[in-house]
Amino acid sequence: VVGGDECNINEHRSLVAIFVSTEFDCGGDLINVEWVLTAAHCTLCAGIPEGGLDTCGGDSGGPLICDGKPDGITS
């Protein structure tokens, strides 16, 4: 933000902080009760440790499966 003003946290109740474990990762805006809008650089790059299979580039998105269960959506 360039030229912004400080504000009280209670003035903008739709802002969210996204944490990975206990580390702040990114911010976003709550656009309804289930969805957060965030910047493209805040997206998840899911894959296998060995490499070669991932959603990091050239993928059109789809379900994110963790431990055999649906856990989200990649884009």
Curated annotation (Swiss-Prot):
PANTHER family reported in the protein's UniProt record = KALLIKREIN-1, KALLIKREIN-RELATED
Record has Secreted as a keyword: yes
- What keywords sit in the KW lines? Blood coagulation cascade activating toxin, Disulfide bond, Hemostasis impairing toxin, Hydrolase, Protease, Secreted, Serine protease, Toxin
UniProt GO molecular function:
serine-type endopeptidase activity; toxin activity
What is the protein name given in its UniProt record? Thrombin-like enzyme catroxobin-1
To which protein family does this belong?
Belongs to the peptidase S1 family. Snake venom subfamily.
- Disulfide bond in keyword set: yes
Subunit note: Monomer.
Which tissues and organs express this gene's product? Expressed by the venom gland.
Q: What is its EC number?
A: 3.4.21.-
Tell me the function of this protein. Thrombin-like snake venom serine protease. Clots fibrinogen (FGA and FGB) very slowly, releasing fibrinopeptide A and a small amount of fibrinopeptide B.
Q: Which InterPro entries match?
A: Peptidase_S1_PA, Peptidase_S1_PA_chymotrypsin, Trypsin_dom, TRYPSIN_HIS, TRYPSIN_SER
GO terms in the biological process aspect are: proteolysis
